[in-house]
C-alpha cells in the first residue's frame, strides 16, 4: 500500500466507513463514511470528521454566551454536513480505561469503563482488501458480540475503530457475526503533528458558547440511558431539559405528518450484555 509505519510511535490517522442497521430486518445499511481514528502511543480517539470540523468552527464562531462573534467561522460550519455521528470514544491504553461521549441534541452523556483486551483467535486466513491492504483474520467474543476482524500486520498499531483493539496490527475490517455492523478502513496516514485527541477532549469538557446538559456514569448505566434516549424521543427531550413535543415532517408532495416519538436502534454493545 506504499505506507510503512514503524512500531516506535508515529502518530497515525485512519479513516473508516461505518455501516450499521437500526433493525435486523433491514437489507440496506446506513453509512457514516467519514469516521476517524487518531492513534498515538498510549491513547486513541475515534470520532467523526465532519463533527470535528463543525465543533472546531463553533468554538471560534461563538462567544461564551452563545452569541456569534466570528461570522466567517459561523458560515463555514455549514460547509460540513449535518447529521453526522457526534459520538466520541477516547481510549487510554496505559491506564486501560476508556470513555465514550454520546452527544444527542444538547446532551453530553459520558460513559467511563475499564478497557478489556479481546482474546483474538488468530487464523491462517489472509487476503488483500479492495484498498490494497494485506490482512489476516481473527475472531473474538467481545463486549457481547462475536467479532470478526481483518488486521494489517504491516501497520504495527494495536488499535482499530470504536473499542476494537488488541490485534497485532491495525484493524482494516471488522464486523459482528450477525453483520449488523461493519467498519472498513479507507486510508491511513502518518501525522506530522499531534493527534486531535487533546482538542476533541477539550471540546467535550468545555464547548464554547454551547449550553449543554451533562451526565456522567459508569459505562453500563450510560449505555442504558443512551439506548433509551435513542429509542424514545420524549425521554431524550426530558434529558435535555425540554418538554416532549411533536415533530411534524412534510413529504415531497407537501403532505404533513407527525413523526413518531419512538424509533428503532441497535447498540454496538447489546442491551443484554449489562444484565
Placement of each model-derived feature along the sequence:
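Glycine- and acidic-residue-rich phosphate-binding/metal-coordinating active-site segment common to enzymes
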Residues: 122-185
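Extracellular or lumenal secretory-pathway regions
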Residues: 8-120, 125-127, 134, 148, ...
